[in-house]
UniProtKB/Swiss-Prot annotation:
GO terms for molecular function: CD4 receptor binding; monoatomic cation channel activity. It is found in: Host membrane. Belongs to the HIV-1 VPU protein family. GO terms for biological process: receptor catabolic process; symbiont-mediated suppression of host innate immune response; symbiont-mediated suppression of host type I interferon-mediated signaling pathway; symbiont-mediated-mediated suppression of host tetherin activity; viral release from host cell. This is Protein Vpu. The N-terminus and transmembrane domains are required for self-oligomerization and proper virion budding, whereas the cytoplasmic domain is required for CD4 degradation. The cytoplasmic domain is composed of 2 amphipathic alpha helix that form a U-shape.
Length: 82
């Protein structure tokens, strides 16, 4: 084969590999964002119920604990989802 088709095939293979890596990173980050939104919704619902009833909902706390979230200071300005 001549050098031009070989270079073209190699460049195409490299481009495909780069695209797979980039989209894999995008999917991983998207899942992190979705998980964080779910956690934020649970915390907001927990706070709302605590304000309404005066005590916290054990079911939602256990759901947060299963996800590995510690309860404590909920600071909206401490968002690290970039």
């Amino acid at each position: 084969m001549q050098p031009i088709p070989i270079v073209t095939i190699v460049a195409l293979a490299v481009a495909i590999i780069i695209a797979i890596v980039v989209w894999s990173i995008v999917i991983i980050e998207y899942r992190k964002i979705l998980r964080q939104r779910k956690i934020d919704r649970l915390i907001d619902r927990l706070i709302e119920r605590a304000e309404d009833s005066g005590n916290e909902s054990e079911g939602e706390i256990s759901a947060l604990v299963e996800m590995g979230v510690e309860m404590g200071h909920h600071a909206p300005w401490d968002v690290d989802d970039l």
